[in-house]
């Protein structure tokens, strides 16, 4: 299968089969793939908090109100950046965004649904996650990825290629 053909059906999933756990080996594979992401000077400033304790889900949905569908999911991964390990000030955000994308693609490859819910740059959300997970000052939360088994087949995406978005050699 062509890489793009495998990638094209990936969608954000917000409906999950409840009470279905993801095997530990699959979780490890997903995180290993996330860590294959490129990073400035290969600093790899990412840190991952895996949350499979469903008693924490209500607190998470209060901290990030646009992820209420977490309640039915199997787990969540909070992707954080370590500012003591970044290449330059602010580089953790780009590096951790690349790791988040790899994480989403790894979920898709394993037939798991996932949805990227933003934490950064919303200061209140960041503070909520820092408090909720006792993050030290040099660890910054970037994203929350909700993961689970899709309750339904995601609808097929429209063609996203738009020639007008491409600029050759200048604007």
Where are these regions (language model features)?
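Acidic, surface-exposed loops and disordered segments
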Residues: 1-171
């Amino acid at each position: 299968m062509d890489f793009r053909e495998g990638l094209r059906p990936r969608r954000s999933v917000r409906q999950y089969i409840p009470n279905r756990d993801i095997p530990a080996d699959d979780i490890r594979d997903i995180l290993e793939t996330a860590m294959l992401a490129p990073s400035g000077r290969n600093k790899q400033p990412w840190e991952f908090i895996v949350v499979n304790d469903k008693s924490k889900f209500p607190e998470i949905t209060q901290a990030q109100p646009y992820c209420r569908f977490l309640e039915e999911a199997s787990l969540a991964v909070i992707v954080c950046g370590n500012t003591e390990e970044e290449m330059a000030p602010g580089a953790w955000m780009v590096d951790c965004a690349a790791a988040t994308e790899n994480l989403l693609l790894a979920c898709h490859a394993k037939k798991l649904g996932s949805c990227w819910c933003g934490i950064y740059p919303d200061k209140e959300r960041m503070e909520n996650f820092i408090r909720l997970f006792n993050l030290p000052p040099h660890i910054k939360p970037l994203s929350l990825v909700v993961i689970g088994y899709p309750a339904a087949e995601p609808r097929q995406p429209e063609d996203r290629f738009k020639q007008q978005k491409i600029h050759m050699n200048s604007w």
